[in-house]
Amino acid sequence: MTNKFILKRCTVDAWDRNCLETSLTSLKGVLTDTALDPEILRKLLEFQAEDGSFLLTDSWNMPADARVDYGYVPTYLGAAILMRAYLAPEPQLPREQIADALVRALRLSCKRRLAGHGYEAEEGTLFALRVFKLGGLRDFLEKDPAICPEFQAVVWSLIDEREAQLKSEGTIQGAWQEDYTDAWHELLEEIRPGRRRYLAYGSNMCAEQMRYRCPQAAKIGVTYLKDWSLRLYGVATIEPNPGDKTPAVIWEISRDDEKSLDRFEGYPECYTKQNFIVTVQGTRFSVMAYVMTERNKQRLRNTTPSEHYLEAIRRGYEENGLGEGRPTKRSIPSQP
C-alpha cells in the first residue's frame, strides 16, 4: 500500500481534479486497509496542515462545496485513520504523537458539525459518521472521553438529535424529502456506545435515587456547570445565566440506565438532551444533561416543587459535599 499512497496539495489557482481525487482515494484505501503501515502514518503526519486539517489545496479560499469535498472530507478521513491508529493495542508510532495529531484533526473536523454541503447536508453527516465508524468511533467515545471533548460533544449531540427526531416523528428526511430513516437507524445502532457520562443537577444527584433508576450507574465525580443556574418549575432544570454556576454530579451510565432516565424525564417531550464540556479533577470531557423544554416550562409555570422533592436534591448536595447553590425558593422562577 505504501507505494500507492499518494497525498498531494494542489494550488487553488491551478485546479487538478485528478490529483485531488487520487489523494482522496489514497486516504480511503488506508482507512479500509487491514493493517496500518507505519510509513504511511508518518507521511500522513507530515502532510497535516498547521490548522490540523488534511486540506488537499493550498488555501481554504475556494467555493463552499469544494471546501467540504477537498478540505473537510480529507480531514475526516485523516482523523479517522489517526483514531484507528490511536486505538490500536500496539500503535505503530508513539501514542502521544498520534494523539496530538488526532486532537488537532478532530477540532477542525467539528467546525461544521460534520454537515455536508448545501442540500446534501444530511447525506454528508451520514458519510462523515460512517468514516469515523471505520476509525473505531464507538470505542473512542466510550473509552477515551477526554480526547478532544469538543468533537465528542458534537457527535453525541448528533446522536441525541437524530434519536429524538426518530422517537418523536418516526422519520428523518433530507432537504428534498429523501428518506434517511433506515440509514440513521442502522448507523446509530453501529456507533452508539454502551455507556456515556451524564450530568445530574437535581434529585438524581442522590445516590439512593440513582440506584433505583440506574442500577448500573457509577459515580465519576462532582463539578460545577459554569454559566448555568438551577431553576425549579415543580421539578428541576437548568437555564443559561452568565457568571453563575450549578453544582452537579457526573455519573457513567449504561444504555439501559439512559433508557430508564428517558422515561423518568419524559424525553424528548418534557426534556431534551444537551451536551456540555465539564472538568472533573483536572480532566475535561463531554457530558449529557436533560434540559426542560419551553413547552414543559409553560405547562409547569404555576407548579411548585414538593418538600420531598427538594429534600432529595438537598440530600444529593450533602452526600457530595456541595454546600453552595442548595435549592431554595429563589430557585423557583417568578410567575408572570
List where the protein language model places each region.
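Preference for long, amphipathic alpha-helical scaffolds in soluble/luminal domains
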Residues: 1-193
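Glycine-aromatic micro-motifs
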Residues: 192-336
